[in-house]
């Protein structure tokens, strides 16, 4: 069997890297004969972090080219794509509506052809399908449907769902994939609250917890060993922080309020006799400098 794992992972972010590594380790443990290719928006840094070959994401490259198009026509096309491209793709998948006869960008056609090489597609988590990220998040899934390939969505958090066009695509994609495996229950609550189909939902975990610990052959570097020694001295809680934007307005809070609340949490942890270590889970590679993911243990 030949699988393709795709999604917005390992972009200089150790949390995303752990999500992918956990899935790869689990597949290797359960079905070592399976051939697995990995695709990322940032193949060079991802390959370095994972210590394995990684393919570039052609849809991401196409999006960058379209967004950087110069001149008046370039700007007009960008507006039209933003408004109609996802509807054209959905019409192609369902073979319905007037938009199904409109030509799609060559990058989509080439990507569908690439997907035909695989037996199944896995779109790995974590928080990828968020309405504030927009409808382009569904392009890989729609292309998988056009290629008529099984699509498994593993280890996801989804929602909120407060945009009509986003909800339309979420309903179709989540209802037609082979499985939508969620890593927590809050996403399921959001889906039910917004009337998003839950027929394909399964309860799962964050695949980062499936990473092989490599106890026998693990050799920590100087920095890692330093923090391991620090954590061994007393009871320890590790935290990671983030910049809230653009979610601060959605959450009805501010960066300052978030930081003040977190400082209160830290003080209570200290009062319980723990030490607190703040860790960055991001590398800064490929311009990904936001420390906004879980601590990947």
Residue ranges of model-derived segments:
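Active-site anion-handling motifs in enzyme catalytic cores
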Residues: 1-297
């Amino acid at each position: 069997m030949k699988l393709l794992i795709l999604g917005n992972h390992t972009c200089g972010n150790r949390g995303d890297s752990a999500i992918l590594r956990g899935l790869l380790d689990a597949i290797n443990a359960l079905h070592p004969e399976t051939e697995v290719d990995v695709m990322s928006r940032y193949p060079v840094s991802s390959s370095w972090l994972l210590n394995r070959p990684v393919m570039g994401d052609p849809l991401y490259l196409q999006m960058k080219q379209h967004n950087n198009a110069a001149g008046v026509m370039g700007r007009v096309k960008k507006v039209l794509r933003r408004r109609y491209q996802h509807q054209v793709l959905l019409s192609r998948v369902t073979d319905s509506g007037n938009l199904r006869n409109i030509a799609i960008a060559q990058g989509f056609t080439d990507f569908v052809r690439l997907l035909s090489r695989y037996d199944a597609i896995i779109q790995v988590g974590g928080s990828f399908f968020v309405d504030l990220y927009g409808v382009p998040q569904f392009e890989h899934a729609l292309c998988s449907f056009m290629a008529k390939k099984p699509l498994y969505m593993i280890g996801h958090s989804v929602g909120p769902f407060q945009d009509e066009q986003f909800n339309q695509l979420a309903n179709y994609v989540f209802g037609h994939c082979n499985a939508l495996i969620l890593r927590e229950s809050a996403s399921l609550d959001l889906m039910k609250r917004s009337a998003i189909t839950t027929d394909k939902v399964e309860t799962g975990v964050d695949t980062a917890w499936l990473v092989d610990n490599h106890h026998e052959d693990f050799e920590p570097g100087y920095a890692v060993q330093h923090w391991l020694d620090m954590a061994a001295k007393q009871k320890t809680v590790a935290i990671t922080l983030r910049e809230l934007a653009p979610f601060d307005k959605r959450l009805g809070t501010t960066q300052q309020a978030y930081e003040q609340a977190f400082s209160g949490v830290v003080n209570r942890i200290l009062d319980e006799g723990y030490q607190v270590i703040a860790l960055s889970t991001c590398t800064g590679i490929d311009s990904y400098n936001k420390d906004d993911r879980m601590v990947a243990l």
